Amino acid sequence: MKPYRIALYNLTTTTKSGGIETFQIGLARALARRGHTVHLYGGEPSAGFLPPQGVEVRTYPFIPRQRFPDLGTRFRKFAERLSFARHAGKDLVRGKYDLILVSKPFDLPALLRASRCSGARAVFHSGGTEFFPGYGLLVRRLDRFLACSAHNAARIREYCGVEPQVLWNGVDTERFRPLPRNGQLAERYGIREEEAVTVSACRLVGLKGIRYGIEAVRMLADEGCRVKYLIAGGGPERPRLEAFSRELGTTGRILFTGEFPNDQLPELYSLAAAAVFPTVGEEAFGISIAEALSCGVPVVATRVGGIPEVVPDGGGLLVPPRDGTAIARVLREWLPDPARRRRMGEAGRRHVEANFSWDRIGERFETLTGLAQ
């Protein structure tokens, strides 16, 4: 297959970290490894941004959304993206690209204009349901329309009658891999050899449902189970969750690590007997769940959104949302059975390698967008 010139365009790829940003960087790296020329477009970067190997990064100024009049969230997002396109758009047209990919619907006008002026294929990979008037008209003009899960594709079809093809998010399986127990980290958090550890790694917002994980651990502790729950991440819900933990009398059982670097999460998962993701809101995919599975940790997660597509039979279990009792029931079975947890961890790892590795995602991207023809 001949190499192509590809632009991945997303303002926040270079200014923050999250699922969309991880996807853009991971796909850029995967496509570069497959021989393509890849340019990553983003806003003027924040400190600490590391360009992916083999990828040229192009950054441009923009006006932060907070500086625009508060005429609604959608207005501010559009205005911010248009301010970015004002600086980046010319290079996007002049870059002689074969394909341009965006990951946010607010970039669709800039994408379609660049495609019309340059002849590049216009591709949108949806990671959520940020709908707005005119969304359906814009996506009908795309050359390829992709979604991060079958659930997300179905939600889009319900909204505008157009169903994208599915391209799951990817996981860096070289970084997220099973590791030996990190004794220094265990010592830092006061974890003893005989204690079972459960982990949740996510942003602490209401839709992540962490209070139900806390409830489950309280139930297990009341039964005499020697368990600790590490909650890795920051966010506005942390003070309320800490207060809730104190109310339940779980002080010493529940440990809030604060912000935890993504590239160090495998070390945290090396302590885990299980990972808990008690999501209660819309989750288009569940990248944190896939990362835990890739580290060989069995997962208990909720049956919402695209999460069932991530959790394999034999590698984890799904429970109803808002049900701490169901989470406790699963952990009660798993924690005393290391052989079962090991088998589940191996099954989860195989599932991620087969479906979500970046080599696999890069290959499927080429097929879905017509580059493999």
Residues of each region from the PLM?
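Short His-centered aromatic/hydrophobic patch
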Residues: E80-F84, V102-D107, S126
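A conserved mid-protein helix/loop that constitutes part of the nucleotide-sugar donor-binding site
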Residues: T22, G26, A196-M219, C225, ...
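Nucleotide-activated donor-binding/catalytic signature segment of Leloir-type glycosyltransferases, i.e.
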Residues: E242-F260
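Conserved acidic donor-binding segment of nucleotide-sugar-dependent glycosyltransferases
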Residues: D313, L317-G324, E333-A339
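Short alpha-helical donor nucleotide-sugar binding micro-motif in glycosyltransferases
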Residues: E259-F260, E267-A272
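A short helix/loop element that forms part of the nucleotide-sugar donor recognition site in Leloir-type
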Residues: R177-I191
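Carbohydrate-associated surface elements
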Residues: H151, G170
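Acidic donor-binding loop of glycosyltransferase active sites
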Residues: S270-A284, V297
